[in-house]
Amino acid sequence: MPTINYLFASQDFPDAPGPEGIRVAIGDGNVMFGAIRIEHAPDGSDNINPVVVFGVKQGLGVGKALVVDALKKHPDLRLVARGHSVGFYEALGFVRCGWEDIDPKYRTDCDMCPMLGTCGPVPFKSVPARHVLTFLGTSSGCGVPAFFCHCPACEEARRDPSKRRGCTGVVIQGNGTTLIDTPPDVRQALIREGFDTIDELFLTHAHYDHLGGLGELEYFIRLCREDTLPFRGSSHALAEALQEFSYMDDCFELDAIDDYATRSFDGMTIQALPLNHCPGAFGYLITTPNGHRTFYAPDTAELKPEVVEILKGVDTLIMDATFWKNVGVHKTHHTVRQTVDEGINLLGAGKVILQHLAPHMCDEGVNEIHEIYQYAAQFGGRVAVAEDGMKVEL
């Protein structure tokens, strides 16, 4: 029997063991508050049958917590509601559907029920989650402003906090919350954007500007989550992360991903694509239930031919655009123009979003950030410059 992990942090309900398909809410003294059973029907659908909340705990949000947690791993749920539970599921965003959307097993159960004429059964199905990507940071490792730099972009950011950029990282939120990378300033960024929980953690690579904030998650995991956090990346990146944060080796459920392998969570499919940057570096191709494909690659040199083939026609390309001009370019990054050229002409991307910016090696008196915005403007909205806090619907 597996352990049901991280169910009710926001309601302060700790974890509890239970059989596959059943999630339970347990309070202090091992008192059970409620349970939900998810059944996989012959037609391939996942069905709630049933949600049970014990009377003494009704009104505390136990049922809502059970259903919301179930949606993270079973985004397409079906059920038959009766009586007061009809309003409960409508409040959670479920929509009424036809009986043809319900597996015959459950339709037959209703047909045979002696209470059919009085209980008024109503078929429901969940609505696919709307996934939104939020940029926690959009700079290279130095940040903007860099403490040592007095270029026009950094000086402007000193005067105007809205121009500041933290190290690169993103959150994707649907029913669940997925964090990609833990930059050194991840705590401040999560607070700024209003995120208070994490369900999954992916690592692109183990350089400090993408890993340095991992320690900020320790007490969230130990005190709030009270169970291990799924931590996914290449075997090389995970090994380096645990070498640096060895005191957190009991905090994670490690998942070493092979090149081109996929993982599924919250209705998304996330594919790890190898990059030319450092050993074990990945970009992640994220496909949401609506078929939208987004490639997130904060650090990369020229894309591998195999990766190019996979990415052709990608809807949104969010990629390394570290340098504005060729000054300072080396073999592990892109310039802005390279990213735009690859995105539009090589991949045929619907939209290109520039990130991981480093405006510090500029000509005297030149604000490279301004010049990047001016350059992007000529593409009629097809090219955008990422900003801290910017949100993109996937």
Where are the regions that the model predicts?
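Conserved active-site alpha-helix within GNAT-family acetyltransferase domains
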Residues: 83-108
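Cap/insert and terminal regions of metallo-dependent hydrolase folds
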Residues: 302-390
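Conserved acetyl-CoA-binding loop-helix of GNAT-fold acetyltransferases
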Residues: 59-72
